[in-house]
């Protein structure tokens, strides 16, 4: 098998559009399975995880290799739910072409829009699915696609629609033939006489689209005003590859209508790996280079997905150059390790079929690669390259996670690490300041699924709560206080006495310590103990126990005992001075402020700005993107952002995205300060 015999196809689109059902029908139609599974029955090839079956949604990228007319079509079924967009990015990384799947009754879905945007310049085609269902409206759906994506939209079929707007047969505009489904198979039928004019007009439009992709074809079309099916296919393939043409097909994954035509279109129009431009990469010295798809070159492959579950661990690779065989040793430039490869597999759902090699342009799995992660490159040690991985979105929704019992703490950590191998889009941070383990992902569904997997796979009952905000405390006035520590226990005692001036400063967050002692009232050898006592005291402020920042402390006087004084005594004396001074120094809470950049369609600008006002946000600017969207920049307190990922999704019908990064601390308004102090006290009492 060569790259010319392979097509790598990502199925993308809105959740519920029927991507998994389409993959299932493709398998069934090509004898890849002996029965047609259904999502509602929980028996499809691609949705095999317990959570997928329970929720009836796709959660992970799944693979359905289809053999059609001697060509291997690697169908990659990506989740449509936005919480699992990272899985779609992995599919896009491995695919040369995407099929965007939409439901005929949904018109232009948000998932279709976002998938189109995620693809960048990668080739694509559209399959309007579920045309056999009530309320389906192919015409409205097509109009919406043309309105959004413009002249690239090129229907290559004309549906035969009954009085209920259901599609009963399909006209192939390329070959001027029609098909219906009989007994689960495509069967030729006559083009309805009343559609003759419509079909002729649509074929003329398709010829024009094909001719527009190639100068030679354009001249031929202008000379004769006609193109053969072969010429049309040639032009459309060029247009698909350069992005000027997006073919549109339709049908039903449930009945099989239009599915074989889609398979044929993938064969005819989808590019192969060697059609694609060279990939950006780096050499061993970090220099930017280009790596072309080359079956005869030194081996290079990208790990675009890791499957780690009860069935084992598989590293999914796409071979960019050369060939991968099971007896190879390949170099991983990320870790510096040379990896001896184990068995190779072709994945179909949860099952892996062993194979001897994976050729250039193909995808497959390597078993039991414990030190290899998603995004790593595996290459020939004498020709080291680092291929570009996946640019996953920044996690934007966080929850604190903890086990119900202390005995499960270690199991929780192990489980999260294992799940992170499979899904690198979520992050885990052990926050030493708030004493919480915080898990961050794309949204609440992703976090909920991770908790369910912790339970079923690792036996950990995890609890979620709101992450605590890391406030700071500072003072606003200058105070001088004495700290005197004296303790007598029988013989020798403990004695330390300090006078310290506490004042605000703006030079740095860390405390500035100075000593201005005259006459030896405090010996110099005790200065470090005083400083240490103050720095330790700064870890717990007097308002709510948060770290104290922007503080200057100057040791100005004190006294000592030649026998009883010690470093520990002066350290404790400094602590007493700190505790006495800060309540009188007008302490105030400081809250973390972050920079928010939210990208939204123009129509939602008013709602989003109004919501930011409620969150105490300050709008800093707006920048139009040029495609009907705005990037709104604002500064918002972190305490007001805990549910923003969910709220923005609701406000914008999932069309809004955002990034949020900490920039600085600011004084907390009185009402917010009172609330934060009350929460801190309640937490301290509970613990």
Language model features with spans:
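Structural and coupling elements of P-loop NTPases
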Residues: 1-687
């Amino acid at each position: 098998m060569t790259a010319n015999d392979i097509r790598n196809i990502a199925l993308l689109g809105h959740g519920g559009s029927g991507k998994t059902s389409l993959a299932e029908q493709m398998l069934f139609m090509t004898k890849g399975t002996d029965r047609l599974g259904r999502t509602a029955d929980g028996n499809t090839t691609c949705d095999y995880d317990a959570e997928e079956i329970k929720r009836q949604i796709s959660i992970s990228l799944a693979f359905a290799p289809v053999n059609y007319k001697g060509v291997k079509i690697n169908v990659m079924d990506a989740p449509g739910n936005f919480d699992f967009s990272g899985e779609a990015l992995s599919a896009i990384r491995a695919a040369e072409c995407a099929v965007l799947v939409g439901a005929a009754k949904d018109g232009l879905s948000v998932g279709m829009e976002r998938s189109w945007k995620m693809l960048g310049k990668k080739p694509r085609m559209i399959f309007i699915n579920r045309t056999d269902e009530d309320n389906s409206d192919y015409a409205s759906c097509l109009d919406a696609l043309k309105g959004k994506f413009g002249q690239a939209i090129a229907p290559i079929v004309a549906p035969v629609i009954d009085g209920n707007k259901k599609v009963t047969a399909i006209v192939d505009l390329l070959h001027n033939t029609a098909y219906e489904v009989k007994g689960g198979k495509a069967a030729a039928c006559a083009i309805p006489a009343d559609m003759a004019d419509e079909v002729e007009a649509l074929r003329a439009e398709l010829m024009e689209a094909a001719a527009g992709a190639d100068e030679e074809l354009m001249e031929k079309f202008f000379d004769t005003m006609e193109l053969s099916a072969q010429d049309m296919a040639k032009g459309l393939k060029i247009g698909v590859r350069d992005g000027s043409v997006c073919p549109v097909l339709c049908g039903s994954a449930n009945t099989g209508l239009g599915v074989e035509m889609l398979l044929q279109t993938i064969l005819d129009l989808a590019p192969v790996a060697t059609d694609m431009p060279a990939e950006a990469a780096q050499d061993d010295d970090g220099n930017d280079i280009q790596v072309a798809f080359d079956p005869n070159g030194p081996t290079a492959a990208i790990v675009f997905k890791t499957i780690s579950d009860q069935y084992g661990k598989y590293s999914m690779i796409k071979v960019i150059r050369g060939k991968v065989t099971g007896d190879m040793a390949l170099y991983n430039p990320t870790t510096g390790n040379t990896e001896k490869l184990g068995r190779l597999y072709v994945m179909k759902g949860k099952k892996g079929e062993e194979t001897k090699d994976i050729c250039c342009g193909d995808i497959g799995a390597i078993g039991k690669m414990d030190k290899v992660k998603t995004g790593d490159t595996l290459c020939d040690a004498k020709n080291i390259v680092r291929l570009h991985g996946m640019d996953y979105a920044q996690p934007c929704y966080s929850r604190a996670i903890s086990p119900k019992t202390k005995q499960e703490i270690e199991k929780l950590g192990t489980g999260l690490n294992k799940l992170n191998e499979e899904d690198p889009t979520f992050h885990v941070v052990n926050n030493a300041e708030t004493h919480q383990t915080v898990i961050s992902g794309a949204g609440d569904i992703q976090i909920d699924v991770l908790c369910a997997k912790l339970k079923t796979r690792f036996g950990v009952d995890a609890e979620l709560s709101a992450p605590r905000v890391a406030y700071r405390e500072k003072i606003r006035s200058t105070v001088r206080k004495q700290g005197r520590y004296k303790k007598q226990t029988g013989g020798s005692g403990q004695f330390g006495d300090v006078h310290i001036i506490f004042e605000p400063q703006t030079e740095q967050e860390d405390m500035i310590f100075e000593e201005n002692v005259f006459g030896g009232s405090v010996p110099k050898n005790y200065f470090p103990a005083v400083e240490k006592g103050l720095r330790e005291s700064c870890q717990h402020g007097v308002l709510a126990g948060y770290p104290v920042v922007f503080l200057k402390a100057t040791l100005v006087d004190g006294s000592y005992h030649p026998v009883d004084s010690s470093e520990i005594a002066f350290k404790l004396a400094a602590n007493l001075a700190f505790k006495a001074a800060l309540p009188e120094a007008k302490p105030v809470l400081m809250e973390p402020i972050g920079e928010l950049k939210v990208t939204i369609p123009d129509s939602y600008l008013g709602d989003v700005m109004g919501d930011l006002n409620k969150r105490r946000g300050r709008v800093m600017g707006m920048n139009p993107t040029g495609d009907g969207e705005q990037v709104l920049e604002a500064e918002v307190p972190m305490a007001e952002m805990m549910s923003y990922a969910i709220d923005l999704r609701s406000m914008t019908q999932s069309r809004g995205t955002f990034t949020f990064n900490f920039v600085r601390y600011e004084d907390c308004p009185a009402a917010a300060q009172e609330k934060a102090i009350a929460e801190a006290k309640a937490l301290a009492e509970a613990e």
